[in-house]
A protein has these predicted regions:
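Surface-exposed, charged secondary-structure patches
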Residues: 71-115
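Short, low-complexity N-terminal intrinsically disordered segments enriched in polar/charged residues
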Residues: 2-42, 54, 94, 98, ...
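Short solvent-exposed beta->alpha transition segments
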Residues: 49-89, 188-198
Length: 198
């Protein structure tokens, strides 16, 4: 009779409940970023909206397709799609989870920086670019867990959040429309130069 409590004799290793590890390491990330940036660069060269789907999804796919539509109607380089920066990696925050979808946040670039959100929908799916944005100059990053540890995603009902994420979208819209007359203005630092610029 097998001894299922002994990992040496047991036919499969014992599970360690509650221990979550990072879903990606830096060598995997480097390969994924290289593959994504190559697919996007080829699609950018021909404004091929369909080939993007291989490694781009969600809001990033919508943004890229809209950029291609603008670029197709203009010869001005101002409307050229933003290049996806695969390196150097400035910040790498993989998820720590055993479920899907899995998300990883990466900040890349040198003189100009981008934040990229990568998502894997299932265990047999490739990571795809889910969201991206250029960052403002002189931005500083908060301290994050080490890449070997990863980070857990917060649930919407987390008690440590000052508001639920669903309300945040409504509040941001109200704030943009009404400015400092919005009841949401109390949550904004009035001395923040970025807020004044927007």
């Amino acid at each position: 009779v097998p001894d299922y409590q002994n990992p040496i004799i047991s036919p499969k290793p014992l599970e360690q409940p509650g221990v979550l590890t990072a879903t990606l390491d830096s060598s995997q990330l480097e390969r994924i970023l290289k593959e994504i940036s190559e697919v996007v660069a080829v699609a950018d060269a021909t404004l091929d909206r369909e080939s993007l789907e291989v490694r781009v999804t969600g809001p990033a796919l919508e943004i890229r397709r809209a950029a291609y539509a603008l670029a197709a109607k203009s010869t001005d380089s101002l409307f050229a799609p933003t290049k996806i920066l695969a390196s150097p990696v400035q910040l790498f925050l993989p998820g720590a989870t055993d479920t899907w979808p899995r998300n990883t946040i990466v900040v890349t670039g040198e003189n100009s920086l981008q934040v990229l959100v990568l998502r894997q929908d299932g265990p047999r799916d490739d990571y795809k670019l889910y969201q991206y944005s250029d960052l403002l100059p002189n931005i500083s990053f908060p301290e994050v867990p080490a890449e070997v540890v990863g980070a857990n995603a917060l649930k919407e009902d987390n008690k440590f959040l000052s508001m639920d994420p669903a309300s945040l979208v409504e509040g941001l819209g109200n704030l943009l429309n009404r400015g400092f007359e919005s009841p949401w203005a109390l949550l904004i630092d009035p001395d923040n130069q970025y807020v004044a610029d927007v």
